Amino acid sequence: MSSQSAYQLPISFRKSNQLSFAPAVRQYISNKYDQHPDMFRQDIEVIDALRRDAINVREPHTSGIRKLQAYAAQLVWISGKFPIDIGADFTWYPALGYNTDRPLVQNNLQYELLNVLYNLAALYCQLALSTNSNGDSNAIKTAANYFSHAAGVLSHMKTAVLPELRMPSPPEDMDEATLESLEQLMLAQCQECYWQKAVAEGYKDATIAKLAARASDLYNSAAEAAMKSEAISSAWIHHISAKHHHFAAAAQYRASLDCLEKRKYGEEIARLQDAVACANEGLREARGGYLKEGVAEDLRRLKMRAEEDLKRAEHDNDMLYLLPVPTKPELKILDRANLAVARIPAQVSAPVDHIGDEAEFGPALFSKLVPYAVHMAVSIYEERRDRLVNNNIIHELEVLTERMHEILSSLNLPGSLQALEKPLGLPGPLIQHAEEIRQADGINRIQRSFADIDKLRSSDIAVFEEGKSLLVTEEEEDQRLRRRHGTQRWARPESRQDPAGGQKLWAQVGEIEGYFASSTSSDGIVREKYLAIEDTLMVLSGSDRSLMDFVPSSRRTEIPESVKPALGRLRGAYNDVLRMESRRRKRVEALRERARSDDIKPDILRETGRLERAYPGTTLAAAHFDDFFERRLDSLYEDDLALLERETAEQEKCLNEVSRVNREFESQRRAAGADKAGGKEREAALQKLDSAFYKYKEIVSNVEVGRKFYNDLSKIVGTFRDTCRTWVAERRKDARSLEDEISMPPLGSLSLQQTPSQQSSQYYSQQQQQQPRSPPQEAHHSAYADTGSMPPQQPRPLPAANAQQTWSQNMPIQFGGPPGTAQQTQPAQAGAKKPVGGTWDPSAGIRFG
């Protein structure tokens, strides 16, 4: 029996980036700390070691179970001591869906826990698949146990962790529908293991039918949940649906064998008919090439066996038994035997019980930490390597190829050759080009790519606009407060001149807007390219008949003898160009593969050890590896850089030869009159189709570059938005502190005769009235000045009704009278003593005598 593990679906691991945690009493930013072991506290070392171990689990080995469980348990433990937004930005790449290269960054402990548990479920799943590859009974039982634990972990994530996530929306590949689908899939594959074991050990057909029926139910539940998920791919949905129909057919087939044994010949026929129908339904899922060949082949074999038995059963029943065949609604529904149960490991359901000095997941599992600068250096090297390979080598080679095709197109090649060599029908290269576009679903592929790019650009713009709006709002708030309090008192830099972040952020606004402007222009150019060839691509992606209708036949079917020598030389020169292009394409693919396999980690760790020995006590930084990077890049890619010069020279030589031979060919063709008799129209049509094909290849390359650009830009705008949030929060906090400082009453306004409540009332009265008189500071000074030195103010004429408001020595002192009365008060006893000029202002305090 072939192993079923090859036909079961694995859950892939989610990938993450390195970071460090914060101590219990403060937030700790991953890119601000020094990773030298002597400078870390023990708890930081422990949690960093646990996380590093957990995120590096990438292979189905049992040692990874403890690593993931220990880290998950530690996360649960520290979530009781720290807030959920601990201050560490956890970056994880999705494992499902169509954005697996686009990470999601969250400052959220529950998000980190959800990812770690997801990887634990993936590990259980992959262990099940690797264990079941042997096919023996004990291995199958162990695989079923692993699938059961995978389902249990997914169930725990869905019911215990996801509700506590505290995010606006969960990641699309870990939402409730996706987790439900994965849980049901794990249970289905667990049930399939028990079914496989029963078949291998020769259980009764009735028992095997019950096991298969339950497996079919579980696959159906997984498919229904997958339809509600945005992350489960179409290929997975087709696979799961096919397995649902497969096990439904297998259940009915085994039930038919049981009926045969019990001499229920009519029911046997009905169940065989249903088995064939279910197998046909499963085979429909194979359309479009979604299924693995082994899955489809199993369905075909099952269908063939059921059809053979059905033919035999119908013949026997018609000739011998003559029993009625029940309809499908009349058939008794098969019983189910459910052996697949979601079992949550105790280390996951009660993790804190396994933490402690003497417990299973004790602290200080690892003491050695790799400096963070090394991880940064690896990223810097990979960025430099990719820039060197993609921009300096591959891009230049692609430019050479594009220039080559432009020159060939200007020479009407290969159209002029094909029109003369094959005056009737379709040339072979054209048929190959058309088939390639059809197989790739070229037009829909480009349109989907355009839609993806639009979606990515809109998402990036939305994130950027969110950050920019924060800056604009903060600037408006700052200007409003500056106008309210005055420039002298609002003594802090304006938003765009703030050296603490405003200058850099507003400069980034211009840079990112420039990115969007240039990318929008590039997108427009690519779309114009596509629109220019869309009609021709429609012809290429159509049938051969439509191609033949597009390409007219030449009325001359024989090549003139005088043209044949020049034609042969031109064909040879053109073939040299094609061979050169083919060699170049293979070299580019080999270079890409070499760059992908260029793993610097072992070498950079050795270089780290050398630097630490050479410079003891020095904190390593990424800049220390610059010379090492240069030496490595030169040794690995110097020959490829030299290849550019050779390719340029070779192409120039080949194209010069093609141009020379083409002139001879055109001259001979005109002399022989071979460019007439319908040849020009055929040549133009063939050339148009050939040019459209190479433009199509160019557009496909362009849209892939565009997609990568917007994915990379999403990281930039995401960091920009998060930095804006932090900076704006700090500016607002600073503004509140400055406003509180300004709101404190000046010392000159305090008087020993006033109670604190009177002083406060006086101050706020000043702030609210904003009288167009001397500033409060001047009024306070005048209250303590020599009265003889003050020039008398001209008393304001008062109406009689207000005379009673004038203060005299025989009247009590009144504060804050009706509006307008305080400013009109003047001394009434002018003759009793020398009057002091000025009207009384509450803001000036009280002056006696």
Curated annotation (Swiss-Prot):
Pfam families reported in the protein's UniProt record: ALIX_LYPXL_bnd (PF13949), BRO1 (PF03097)
Residue ranges of every copy of the BRO1 domain listed in the record: 7-404
InterPro entries: ALIX_V_dom, BRO1_dom, BRO1_sf
Residue ranges with Low complexity bias: 745-772, 820-835
Entries under Gene3D superfamilies matching the protein: alix/aip1 in complex with the ypdl late domain, alix/aip1 like domains
Gene Ontology CC annotations of this record: endosome
Annotated segments matching region Disordered: 475-502, 738-849
Coiled coil as UniProt keyword: yes
Listed Polar residues bias regions: 802-812
Alphabetical UniProt keywords: Coiled coil
Any coiled-coil regions, as ranges: 260-321
Key word Coiled coil present: yes
Oligomer status and interactors: Interacts with RIM101 by binding to its two YPX[LI] motifs.
Family classification: Belongs to the palA/RIM20 family.
Function field: Required for the proteolytic cleavage of the transcription factor RIM101 in response to alkaline ambient pH. May act as a scaffold protein that recruits the calpain-like protease RIM13 via VPS32 to its substrate RIM101.
Protein's UniProt name: pH-response regulator protein palA/RIM20
Protein species of origin: Pyricularia oryzae (strain 70-15 / ATCC MYA-4617 / FGSC 8958) (Rice blast fungus)
Taxonomic placement: Eukaryota, Fungi, Dikarya, Ascomycota, Pezizomycotina
